[in-house]
Amino acid sequence: MSNITYKADEYADSKKFPFRIHVEKYTIFELLGDPTGKRVLDAGCGDGIYSRQLVDQGASFVIGVDGAKDFIELAKQKNGGYEERIQFVHSFIQDFPGNGDLDSVIASYVLSYPKSLEEATAYCKAMASHLKSGGKLIGFNNNPFEVFDGVKHADYGFEKEMHGDTEGSPVIYRVAGMDNPIVNFHLHPKTYERAFREAGFSEFRWQRVLLNPNQQGNSYWNNFFSNEPSFVAMLAMK
């Protein structure tokens, strides 16, 4: 059952926020590298914005998968001109095994939804099944190293609320322009590391999120990057 109660069009609009462009998008594409000629799985594709950008940057084929039906419907509406190179599928990622024929996976917030090691491992196994040997997964996720009690970050278009680091406890994002909150779940870093290992990935590392160089020196970002940012990247190799 989906934990997603927010509207697809509202969420798509949030992709215009500065942190989503200059931190989220920049980090994902910088870690992915040149996608020219690559076959890519866009896990948790939402309205397909990164699927289309992957093709624009040279990817030969992209599969976009999302568990929310209205997101996939919106992605298909925006897919004009991309039909031959992007396939959108309505499925939860853990229920969508692959054939080991893709070069890369990008997973935007997908791994913020499991509530346990077992669930996280199922997500990771499904994504691993799409990758060739030597294939790469880039994740962008709620940061499990950031633990606090209260609310923070209202000045970046969202408020993040959490209360301690109990495994499976909710992490709530209230995003400007969205009627309903985004509810993620906290897992310990070691839980994620074990899930990737049990899913068959040969390498895994955490990566601090990156800031687009054209924003360097902009004091707007000082609070975002103080201590542990609210988000973190993951890099795994099969």
Report each predicted region and the residues it spans.
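C-terminal lobe and adjacent flexible extensions of AdoMet/dcAdoMet transferase-like proteins
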Residues: 199-238
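A short acidic, Gly/Pro-enriched loop at the edge of an enzyme's catalytic core
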Residues: 96-105
